[in-house]
Amino acid sequence: MASDHQSPATKQQQPSSKIVLFEQENFQGRCHELSGPCTSLKEAGMEKIGSILVHSGPWVGYEQQNCKGEQFVFEKGEYPRWDSWTNSRKSESISSLRPIKVDSQEHKIVLYENPNFTGKKIEIIDDDVPSFHAHGYQEKVSSVRVQSGTWVGYQYPGYRGYQYLFEKGDYKDSSDFGAQHPQIQSVRRIRDMQWHQRGTFHPTN
């Protein structure tokens, strides 16, 4: 079920995960450190998030409490203001966070035109694809099957627009991965930086 992909299960968190949230831009003001899931940053004392420092991760933030709404993927690094973690719209709202489990060196994802894994598809193995159109796939994406690895899909080419986190499992409909419209035009792997493999992609009918 879709809820399985979004539930902040402590069993799946990485022990080394660490993120620091700052109230103001450029790492100023009050800060709050997390090493595990937080379903309500407001209840934890963080009314507003102005900047983020990821010591180890990766993490996924959500616009709403209880890991719902628009998603924001954070990998190790600095995010000094809101537009460094989103380019879909001006959204400064992050209400919940959880670590992302990355435990596979292999990455394989299949994206389908229609719900329930039907219609045209594009299969991607160990590769990042900044534009589906450039590789001959111009269809919508209504369902996704992640066979291995952890991925983030984007609404537009060049890793722009709304972000959608894909962990291992089946997403039978676009609502399962939090999309209002079945539109994904680029995808990349979330991985530890020591894993470098040249990959392949296979658009198929």
Curated annotation (Swiss-Prot):
Q: Which residues form the Beta/gamma crystallin 'Greek key' domain?
A: 17-56, 57-101, 107-148, 149-191
* Gene3D superfamilies linked: Crystallins
Q: Can you summarize the PTM annotation of this record?
A: The N-terminus is blocked.
Name recorded for this polypeptide: Beta-crystallin B2
Acetylation listed as a keyword: yes
Q: Which PROSITE patterns match?
A: CRYSTALLIN_BETA_GAMMA (PS50915)
Q: Record's family? A: Belongs to the beta/gamma-crystallin family.
Record-linked Pfam families: Crystall
Q: Name one GO biological process term.
A: lens development in camera-type eye
- Lineage, top-rank taxon, reads Eukaryota
> Could you tell me the keywords of this UniProt record?
Acetylation, Eye lens protein, Repeat
Q: How does the annotation summarize its subunit structure?
A: Homo/heterodimer, or complexes of higher-order. The structure of beta-crystallin oligomers seems to be stabilized through interactions between the N-terminal arms.
Which source organism does the UniProt entry give?
A: Aquarana catesbeiana (American bullfrog)
Residue ranges of the region described as C-terminal arm:
193-205
Sequence segments annotated as region (N-terminal arm): 2-16
Q: Which residues carry this modification: N-acetylalanine?
A: A2
Q: What is the lineage of its organism?
A: Eukaryota, Metazoa, Chordata, Craniata, Vertebrata
Molecular function (GO) terms for this protein are:
structural constituent of eye lens
Kindly indicate whether the keyword Metal-binding belongs to this entry: no
Q: What is known of its domains?
A: Has a two-domain beta-structure, folded into four very similar Greek key motifs.
